[in-house]
From Swiss-Prot:
Reactions catalysed, as given in the entry: Endohydrolysis of (1->4)-beta-D-xylosidic linkages in xylans
Subcellular location: Secreted
Enzyme active site: E155 (proton donor), E263 (nucleophile)
Disulfide bonds listed in the record: C281-C287
Function: Endo-1,4-beta-xylanase involved in the hydrolysis of xylan, a major structural heterogeneous polysaccharide found in plant biomass representing the second most abundant polysaccharide in the biosphere, after cellulose.
Ranges of residues in domain GH10: 45-326
This protein's name: Endo-1,4-beta-xylanase F1
EC number(s) recorded for this UniProt protein: 3.2.1.8
Alphabetically ordered keywords of this record: Carbohydrate metabolism, Disulfide bond, Glycosidase, Hydrolase, Polysaccharide degradation, Secreted, Signal, Xylan degradation
Gene Ontology MF annotations: endo-1,4-beta-xylanase activity
One of the protein's GO biological processes: xylan catabolic process
Amino acid sequence: MVHLKALASGTLFASLASSAVISRQAAASINDAFVAHGKKYFGTCSDQALLQNSQNEAIVRADFGQLTPENSMKWDALEPSQGSFSFAGADFLADYAKTNNKLVRGHTLVWHSQLPSWVQGITDKDTLTEVIKNHITTIMQRYKGQIYAWDVVNEIFDEDGTLRDSVFSQVLGEDFVRIAFETAREADPNAKLYINDYNLDSADYAKTKGMVSYVKKWLDAGVPIDGIGSQSHYSANGFPVSGAKGALTALASTGVSEVAVTELDIEGASSESYLEVVNACLDVSSCVGITVWGVSDKDSWRSSTSPLLFDSNYQAKDAYNAIIDAL
């Protein structure tokens, strides 16, 4: 194992164009180390602007093996008005991933947030069903064969484990889940189909229990759910990282073929906390990978909490080095 001590140097990224820098980064790729332990990927999120940032892009290219579009594949970005699709941002990420041999997790097809008003205003069941089907089919067929997995539905549960109140549940009840997954399976039969949510960080929490119960029921009914994604946004006042393994084990108990940590960030980014989550995934056989929600703290949605593996100057933190050393 090549350790990553060199990444601690304050001059590491002084010349990102240098092939020597890229070589050193690649020799200590967190993705390569994780895959060597039998997992599919260790990835991050990005989009066009970040991939055109040379400092950010060099790290993505050298150190991560999977990309999730942070915003470019959400409904408001792809279909802002009915039947009018805008693929520029999503195409950029998909093309980058193909060129650089990165897996892609598509994110996300059906979500109550970042949803155009024209969708939110639908009240007719048949209309909403057709809108969901057309949206999913159009997007998934465009990227068929390029997207390893899709977050088909995202954040559909309340904290008590019941279905979230949204236009989808209001108009269609829980049947929108079946509609979405069946449409997705038909559009790209080889893509892994996920249900994704946050606060699934304790096996004993009501939301986790609700997810487990509903997914078991839907699987028994033949809904083609392949995986459960746990976003894993950890904060100082939230769930302890010590519950990660138990939570992933509970999610895996539903019978899905895969579980994954899909949007990991940890307030303070301590080495111990990151290692706890990495070890949790390593210890749960069906946990296929980890995606951290960004590269540098500078670009994080929680930048003030310094939650990522690279600081605001694109320097690898102790947590990154600790993971490499442990692997």
